[in-house]
């Protein structure tokens, strides 16, 4: 009932808005949005209530989120010009990938701190701190992409490298030698290129053309360092 | 000639007429909302007025740039756009600055010719990051190559080198410019004629001067000690020359003793950085890796290890 009373008032206040804005009078232009905001939250709440997730089973909720994550994985593995990865971002996929990568990079024996590969925390810090730095860099360069969208893309695009890590661990089960290393090198280079192609397909359009290289270079460095960590991994 | 003068005169008249017609309040409010528009308007205005008064083109250019710089520093310290002004560069500009740092010439001032009152933090930050990671990666690769030549060396990835390289490079690229900037500010108080660079410009000079070390570090992968030293000396010479040529116009006004001391300290610190990189990351056989094999393996490998000892001493 309250909405029914307020909604006729809404078009009445909306029509003089451009007229007052033209005058650029501060006192009036401040008045109008206040009146507008009274009605809008009520409506959105009502609309939200119809498609509420409160009544559905927990299984449905989890399955829907897992499906969203899986769909984004498919987008990374087959990068197209599509903004699904950008529109509804989440950080579940990056978290899963990062933890998987860090767990697989963990060496079996943590002997001495000085003589070994990256520890779990170091991988975690490199991935998240690197992604945040790249995102800040692209924002500072004037990119029109939101902070979490960029984090989401960078995190999801680790997927090929996580796959490379899995293959490397399997290859390392075989006897060591130059052939073994060559296979790992090939896999890591291919997956590295894949990560770069996928992430630039999503991120490059957010920058003006004369700054695209400046925004893409840090991404290249980021995936290069992760690839290097994967390639030099030896289980012992 | 006369027609050209008339043209410019008309242009000015038009501009003043336009200014007179448009109310002041409206233009200021608009420039507050849309920064690019205000930016353009100021640049045109200052260029015109200075062009009329000063005959020298460079003077007006400089004045316009100064004006531009003042315009840029309008946003407050806590706003995001304040930091965006430090990353306001294009790809071509960054490449031009890198080229300028790679090819120093006497009398060719890096700040005057390449930064042009618009220092950026993109270059210093990412050059430092690249250098740190390249140092760590190549430092590991030398070990791998050493293992290839001599299978008795046990290689394992040394991730701590990333941390060491990152901390040392970033500390050098930020603390030394800070000290230099502070020193020059102090000297300015003593000698009034000096016009020192701003802190950002000093950071920029140092950041871009480190770029030469990236190809040098990659070339250090060649396991020939004398070649490594030649590459090191070449890169150090280029980098230090760029620094000296850029700093010389500032310290020239100071007393001869202070100028010489300052420049030699700058070059010495740069040489220390290069030497430190060489000795820490490019030992062909670090002592940490020599210690474990005797404990694990038996006597024959221990004997096989001893011929490598002179090799490790040779480059260092």
UniProtKB/Swiss-Prot annotation, chain A:
The chain crosses the membrane at residues 85-105, 116-136, 147-167, 185-205, 213-233. InterPro entries: Yip1/4-like, Yip1_dom. The modification N-acetylalanine is found at residue 2. GO terms for molecular function: identical protein binding. Residues 106-115, 168-184, 234-236 are lumenal. Residues 2-84, 137-146, 206-212 are cytoplasmic. Pfam families: Yip1. The keyword Amino-acid biosynthesis does not apply. It comes from the Eukaryota. GO terms for cellular component: cis-Golgi network; COPII-coated ER to Golgi transport vesicle; endoplasmic reticulum; Golgi medial cisterna; Golgi membrane; Golgi trans cisterna; trans-Golgi network. The keyword Transmembrane helix applies. Predominantly interacts with YIPF1 or YIPF2, but may also form a ternary complex with YIPF1 and YIPF2. This interaction may stabilize YIPF1 and YIPF2. Belongs to the YIP1 family. May be required for stable YIPF1 and YIPF2 protein expression. This is Protein YIPF6. The lineage of its organism: Eukaryota, Metazoa, Chordata, Craniata, Vertebrata. The gene is YIPF6.
């Amino acid at each position: 009932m309250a909405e029914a009373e307020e909604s006729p008032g809404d078009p009445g206040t909306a029509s003089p808005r451009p007229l007052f804005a033209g005058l650029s009078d501060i006192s009036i232009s401040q008045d109008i949005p206040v009146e507008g905001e009274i009605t809008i939250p009520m409506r959105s709440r009502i609309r939200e209530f119809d498609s509420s997730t409160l009544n559905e089973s927990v299984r449905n909720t989890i399955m829907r989120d897992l499906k969203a994550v899986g769909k984004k994985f498919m987008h990374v593995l087959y990068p197209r010009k599509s903004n699904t990865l950008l529109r509804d971002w989440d950080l579940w996929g990056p978290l899963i990938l990062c933890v998987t990568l860090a767990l697989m990079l963990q060496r079996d024996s943590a002997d001495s701190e000085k003589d070994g590969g990256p520890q779990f925390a170091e991988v975690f810090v490199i991935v998240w701190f690197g992604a945040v730095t790249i995102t800040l860099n692209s924002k500072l360069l004037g990119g029109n992409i939101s902070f979490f969208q960029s984090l989401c893309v960078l995190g999801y695009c680790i997927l090929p490298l996580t796959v490379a890590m899995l293959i490397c661990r399997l290859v390392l089960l075989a006897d060591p030698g130059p052939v073994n290393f060559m296979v790992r090198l090939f896999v890591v280079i291919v997956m590295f290129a894949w990560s770069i192609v996928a992430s630039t397909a999503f991120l490059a359009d957010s920058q003006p053309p004369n700054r695209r290289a400046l925004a893409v270079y840090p991404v290249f460095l980021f995936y290069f360092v992760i690839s290097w960590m994967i390639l030099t991994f030896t289980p012992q | 000639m006369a027609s050209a003068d008339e043209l410019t005169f008309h242009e000015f008249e038009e501009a003043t007429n336009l200014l007179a017609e448009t109310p002041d309040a409206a233009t200021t409010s608009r420039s507050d909302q849309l920064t690019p528009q205000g930016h353009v308007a100021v640049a045109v205005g200052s260029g015109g007025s200075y062009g009329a008064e000063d005959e020298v083109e460079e003077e007006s250019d400089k004045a316009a740039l100064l004006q531009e710089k003042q315009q840029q520093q309008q946003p407050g310290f806590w706003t995001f756009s304040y930091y965006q002004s430090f990353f306001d560069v294009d790809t071509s500009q960054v490449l031009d600055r890198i080229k300028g740092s790679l090819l120093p010439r006497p009398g060719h001032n890096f700040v005057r010719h390449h930064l042009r009152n618009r220092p950026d933090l993109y270059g210093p930050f990412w050059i430092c990051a690249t250098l740190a990671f390249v140092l760590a990666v190549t430092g590991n690769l030398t070990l791998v190559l050493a293992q290839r030549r001599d299978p008795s060396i046990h290689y394992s990835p040394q991730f701590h080198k990333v941390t060491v390289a990152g901390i040392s490079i970033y500390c050098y690229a930020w603390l030394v410019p800070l000290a230099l900037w502070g020193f020059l500010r102090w000297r300015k108080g003593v000698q009034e004629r000096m016009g020192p660079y701003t802190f950002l410009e000093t950071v920029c000079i140092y950041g871009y001067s480190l770029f030469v070390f990236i190809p040098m570090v990659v070339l250090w992968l060649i396991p020939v000690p004398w070649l490594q030293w030649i590459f090191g000396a070449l890169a150090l010479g280029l980098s230090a020359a760029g620094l000296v040529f850029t700093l010389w116009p500032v310290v020239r006004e100071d007393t001869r003793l202070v100028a010489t001391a300052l420049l030699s300290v700058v070059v010495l610190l740069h040489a220390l950085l290069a030497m430190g990189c060489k000795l820490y990351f490019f030992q062909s056989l670090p002592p940490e890796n020599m210690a474990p094999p005797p404990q694990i393996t038996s006597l024959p490998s221990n004997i096989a290890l001893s011929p490598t000892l002179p090799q490790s001493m040779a480059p260092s």
